[in-house]
Swiss-Prot record:
Homodimer. The lineage of its organism: Bacteria, Pseudomonadati, Pseudomonadota, Gammaproteobacteria, Vibrionales. The keyword Secreted does not apply. GO terms for molecular function: DNA binding; DNA-binding transcription factor activity. GO terms for biological process: regulation of DNA-templated transcription. Controls the transcription of genes involved in arginine and lysine metabolism. This is HTH-type transcriptional regulator ArgP. PANTHER family: HTH-TYPE TRANSCRIPTIONAL REGULATOR ARGP (PTHR30579:SF2), TRANSCRIPTIONAL REGULATOR (PTHR30579). InterPro entries: ArgP, ArgP_gammaproteobact, LTTR, LysR_subst-bd, Tscrpt_reg_HTH_LysR, WH-like_DNA-bd_sf, WH_DNA-bd_sf. Keywords: DNA-binding, Transcription, Transcription regulation. The keyword Transcription applies. Pfam families: HTH_1, LysR_substrate. Residues 21-40 bind DNA. Belongs to the LysR transcriptional regulatory family.
Length: 298
């Protein structure tokens, strides 16, 4: 019986990553019908569909598992072939990491700095909410993910990194305008705030846990940028929950005020990665865990 042909999975990967059969054919230098035939052969071999044929095409659950396998094999091949063939000029090892925006804005880039400068690596840092990054690892879309979840998924390990501490801050002018009589449920309802996106529950959790303010009572802008949070707070347009690590100098200079010094939101974050790591992926995991533990409260 014929085994699994990786050209079939390669075709699936191209269709999913490029978003169409036509662009996948261009990438693989074969006809569009040949791409379709390879995926049909894969589905016949597995006796189940691997692709949801809509625009853009999406992998089924089985398809996602196959893509995870394929990308692992590609990563191992990228690292192993130059070693076996003594090739000096090869393409960098390509890998994707899922991270939340706040980690990227504070400690993640310094953690990766040495590896990016010393190794032939092409990193794709994709941003998702902390509760969603692990889904990307499950689907095989990334080789590692920063997540709130302490439990590793099958075939992966989870390393504790530290605590992300969030302070509720505003400019002195904003504070005087909305909170001159104190930070109370009434004043919090009147003042405009900021959240990252529709999945961001951080602000709502803070207001409910400490002030019993329900989410439907809050004026809440949505801005998909951690750096923009700081700019909005500094401009006096809103108050925000911002990582302490991101605004140390602003707090020291008085440009921002910690509105609730008695209350702080803190939660643990974890680095999830494949168990069987080698080469540059192992170096990345070691760099992330070591640096995070040196700058994040433990």
């Amino acid at each position: 019986m014929r085994g699994l042909d990786y050209r079939w999975i390669e075709a699936l990967d191209s269709v999913v990553s490029k978003g169409s059969f036509e662009r996948a054919a261009e990438q693989l230098f074969i006809s569009q019908s040949a791409v379709s035939q390879r995926i049909k052969q894969l589905e016949k071999y597995l006796a189940q569909p691997v692709l949801i044929r809509e625009q853009p095409p999406r992998p089924t659950l089985v398809g996602k598992k196959l893509l995870g396998l394929y990308r692992r094999v590609c990563l191992i091949e990228q690292e192993l072939v130059p070693e076996l063939t003594n090739q000096e000029h090869v393409r960098p090892v390509s890998m994707s990491i899922a991270t939340n925006a706040d980690s990227l804005a504070t400690w993640l880039l310094p953690a990766l700095d040495k590896v990016m400068k010393s190794r032939q690596v092409e990193l794709n840092l994709v941003i998702y909410g902390e509760s969603r990054t692990l889904d990307k690892l499950k689907n095989g879309e990334v080789v590692g993910a920063i997540s709130l979840e302490p439990q590793p998924i099958t075939g992966c390990s989870a390393e504790y990194l530290g605590q992300m501490e969030y302070l509720c801050v505003a400019s002195p002018e904003f504070y005087q305008k909305y909170f001159a009589k104190g930070v109370t449920p009434r004043s919090l309802i009147k003042a405009p705030a900021v959240s990252y996106d529709q999945y961001d529950e951080l602000h709502n959790k803070f207001l409910w846990d400490y002030f019993a303010v329900p989410r439907d009572k809050v004026i809440n802008h949505t801005v998909g940028s951690s750096e923009a949070f700081v700019r909005l707070a500094l401009s006096g347009a809103a108050y925000c929950l911002i990582p302490r690590l991101q605004i140390i100098s602003e707090l020291e200079s008085g440009a921002l005020i910690n509105m609730t010094p008695d209350f702080m939101l803190s939660y643990p974050i974890f680095w999830h990665h494949w168990q069987l790591e080698t080469g540059v992926l192992l170096e990345i995991s070691e760099a992330i865990t070591a640096y995070a533990k040196s700058v994040l409260p433990q």
